[in-house]
Amino acid sequence: MLKPSDKWSWYFSDSEGYLMLNLGDDMLFRTNLSRNLLVDCAFIENPFTVDDASDFQLYKEHIACLPLSEPRKAELALYCVAAKRFHKPVQPKSWFFDVQGTGYTPQQGQLISLRNSLNSGIFIALEVGENATLCAYSDLVSFALNGSKTLEFGQVIKVMHDRMSDVNTLLYTPQMAMVS
């Protein structure tokens, strides 16, 4: 099991073209964040902070119920930490998703459901704003946004709250029998 360490550090690899996490002991983790997705501070070495470790733990706890192997859960949690800290600010792309209601605002780390006419998927809330949230896709099967665009495991998208529903509501809604 992967345990955060104060010896870890983030850096951008010109040869890989991606943000990397040095885990020590000659172990490296390549994130899914390429140069064009990163804020300026990602291009210098940055320590893995206490906040990063706290976020990693939060994401690990929330994704524990997902049908992923332990290495994939750790990978997703690290993708989430990297995106929350180093992803450039983006505008919502809510038009890819169906409206699911109003009044719902997720909390950081919470699993949410997004759907469209092609599929539905489970995402994890990374950065919650007043009206929209940056979230990461959590399935190994591609999520079709439209006929030509997809989201892959760990990729992020910002979406308005009216497109989201709570995964726990979907998974754990008790069945009720009508009796007379």
Curated annotation (Swiss-Prot):
<dbReference type="Pfam" id="PF21083">
    <property type="entry name" value="ZapC_N"/>
</dbReference>
<keyword id="KW-0131">Cell cycle</keyword>
<comment type="subunit">
    <text>Interacts directly with FtsZ.</text>
</comment>
<protein>
    <recommendedName>
        <fullName>Cell division protein ZapC</fullName>
    </recommendedName>
</protein>
<dbReference type="GO" id="GO:0005737">
    <property type="term" value="C:cytoplasm"/>
</dbReference>
<keyword id="KW-0717">Septation</keyword>
<dbReference type="Pfam" id="PF07126">
    <property type="entry name" value="ZapC_C"/>
</dbReference>
<dbReference type="InterPro" id="IPR048372">
    <property type="entry name" value="ZapC_C"/>
</dbReference>
<dbReference type="GO" id="GO:0043093">
    <property type="term" value="P:FtsZ-dependent cytokinesis"/>
</dbReference>
<comment type="similarity">
    <text>Belongs to the ZapC family.</text>
</comment>
<keyword id="KW-0963">Cytoplasm</keyword>
<dbReference type="GO" id="GO:0000917">
    <property type="term" value="P:division septum assembly"/>
</dbReference>
<dbReference type="InterPro" id="IPR009809">
    <property type="entry name" value="ZapC"/>
</dbReference>
<dbReference type="InterPro" id="IPR048373">
    <property type="entry name" value="ZapC_N"/>
</dbReference>
<keyword id="KW-0132">Cell division</keyword>
<comment type="function">
    <text>Contributes to the efficiency of the cell division process by stabilizing the polymeric form of the cell division protein FtsZ. Acts by promoting interactions between FtsZ protofilaments and suppressing the GTPase activity of FtsZ.</text>
</comment>
